[in-house]
């Protein structure tokens, strides 16, 4: 694989070195994406990286927030709007405290990026039914007017994102409480037909996991129906992508990080139609995380032996950190993968020690696009 030294690239761009690069997502320029947005969950910064040159062409640190409203180093995900006018950063906040949403005005032609607004989320805890409101991931509706925000304690916020320059502020227009949307909030995908798909995961301890689909078609009218809730087999749903079968039907494919399963969900009937394990002789404990699909190839980040986030309590020398490339069947109900379909990211120069004393690679992949 091509390797980019982010510390050097940041220095070359007059940006501070990143800590814990986490989620990487592209913008929506045509005919193809021009930039990716990299959220650094240990340093509170978002890097804007030119895809062709691989250079960091902008960096925005959201620690402290706009006009001191608030913001920590925990910038979990930075997502571009479909019209490319803004990006919203989900800032988890400090441990046991509520987080923030930051708005960055974006211009990918001039590489001009500036923080214009911060929204504190502690004011929504009562409606959510949670002690804190910690945003995890989000996605915009196709018209770039609303963002659906998942939360660590369950529940979901729908935000009218306002204007790109911040003169019209972000406003929460719908609160789904934790009983309506249970589970640790995770990834969000925009589906056809004005729908948004999210996950509700059980985390490292296991428990109930869900896939949700939200009808956004009447959001501009202030109508927000309750989501369709689909219970998932396995433990700790995380990555989710979609697949179109030979008949044109759409399926959700979800990776279960703790139990190493992949679920196939018929989104016409809202039923799980197949579950398949990723565990194999060449990857006994893969720990599949964030996923992306191109054609019939599903790319999944596989976590490391000593995870840096979320499942840090689950150590194992049987991990194979890297990227798995699954070939999805034409009917979107199964996958195949072989040892040659694993792009290893093991790094023998950087080792860590597990609780059992074994020495393993420090590599711990997470986001991919």
Give residue ranges: language-model regions.
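Predominantly soluble domains enriched in secretory-pathway, periplasmic, or organellar proteins
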Residues: 1-369
């Amino acid at each position: 694989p091509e390797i980019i030294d982010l510390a050097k690239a940041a220095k070359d761009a007059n940006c501070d070195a990143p800590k814990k690069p986490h989620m990487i997502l592209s913008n929506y320029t045509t005919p193809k994406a021009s930039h990716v947005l990299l959220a650094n969950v240990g340093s509170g910064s978002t890097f804007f990286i030119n895809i062709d040159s691989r250079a960091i062409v902008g960096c925005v640190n959201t620690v402290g927030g706009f006009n001191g409203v608030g913001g920590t180093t925990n910038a979990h995900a930075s997502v571009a709007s479909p019209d490319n006018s803004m990006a919203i950063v989900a800032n988890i906040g400090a441990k046991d405290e509520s987080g923030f949403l930051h708005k960055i005005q974006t211009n990918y032609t001039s590489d001009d990026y500036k923080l214009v607004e911060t929204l504190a989320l502690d004011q929504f805890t009562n409606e959510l039914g949670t002690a804190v409101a910690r945003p995890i991931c989000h996605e915009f509706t196709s018209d770039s007017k609303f963002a659906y925000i998942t939360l660590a304690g369950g529940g979901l916020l729908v935000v009218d994102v306002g204007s790109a320059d911040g003169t019209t502020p972000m406003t929460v227009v719908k609160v789904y409480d934790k009983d309506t949307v249970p589970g640790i909030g995770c990834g969000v995908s925009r589906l056809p037909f004005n729908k948004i798909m999210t996950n509700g995961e059980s985390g490292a301890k296991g428990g109930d996991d869900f896939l949700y689909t939200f009808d956004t078609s009447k959001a501009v009218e202030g109508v927000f129906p309750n989501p369709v809730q689909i219970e998932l087999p396995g433990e700790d749903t995380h990555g989710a992508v979609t697949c179109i079968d030979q008949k044109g039907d759409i399926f959700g494919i979800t990776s279960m990080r703790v139990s190493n399963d992949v679920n196939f969900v018929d989104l016409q009937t809202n039923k799980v139609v197949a579950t398949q394990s990723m565990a194999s002789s060449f990857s006994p404990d893969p720990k599949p995380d964030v996923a992306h699909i191109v054609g019939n190839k599903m790319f999944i980040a596989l976590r490391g032996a000593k995870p840096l986030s979320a499942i840090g309590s689950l150590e194992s020398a049987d991990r194979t950190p890297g990227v798995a490339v699954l070939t999805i069947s034409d009917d979107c109900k199964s996958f195949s993968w072989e040892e040659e379909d694993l792009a290893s990211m093991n790094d023998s120069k950087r080792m860590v020690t597990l609780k059992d004393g074994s020495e393993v690679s420090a590599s711990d992949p997470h986001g991919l696009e």
